[in-house]
């Protein structure tokens, strides 16, 4: 199986998001990379499911709470930008203040 660099990046991101989901399920607070991966994967999957950019910008703010991440992580992530594949092509989704 041959994968492009972009496809490899997506798989790595998705794998990191799976690790983050498992840690959350065990009650472990997430660090910076895990938090970014989980929110980014949520956006990418939402795009594939047909949600709009506006819907994902709002929904992305409700994936994680301050209680679910390590101290200082929300301040380290002022926004997250993800290039997601929608049914009508790729678009950039920006989520401002993703952890409330």
Swiss-Prot record:
Its EC number is 3.5.1.5. GO terms for cellular component: cytoplasm. It catalyses: urea + 2 H2O + H(+) = hydrogencarbonate + 2 NH4(+). Pfam families: Urease_gamma (PF00547). InterPro entries: Urease_gamma, Urease_gamma/gamma-beta_su, Urease_gamma_sf, Urease_subunit. Coiled coil: none annotated. The keyword Hydrolase applies. One of its GO terms (biological process) is urea catabolic process. Keywords: Cytoplasm, Hydrolase. SUPFAM superfamilies: Urease, gamma-subunit. It is found in: Cytoplasm. Heterotrimer of UreA (gamma), UreB (beta) and UreC (alpha) subunits. Three heterotrimers associate to form the active enzyme. Belongs to the urease gamma subunit family. PANTHER family: UREASE. This is Urease subunit gamma.
């Amino acid at each position: 199986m041959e994968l492009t660099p972009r496809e490899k990046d997506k798989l790595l991101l998705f794998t990191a998001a799976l690790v983050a989901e498992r840690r959350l399920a065990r009650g472990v607070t997430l660090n910076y990379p895990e938090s970014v991966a989980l929110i980014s994967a949520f956006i990418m999957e939402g795009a594939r499911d047909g949600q709009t950019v506006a819907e994902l910008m709002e929904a992305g703010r409700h994936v994680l709470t301050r209680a679910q991440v390590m101290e200082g992580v929300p301040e380290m992530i002022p926004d997250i930008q993800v290039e997601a594949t929608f049914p009508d092509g790729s678009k950039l989704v920006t989520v401002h203040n993703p952890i409330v």
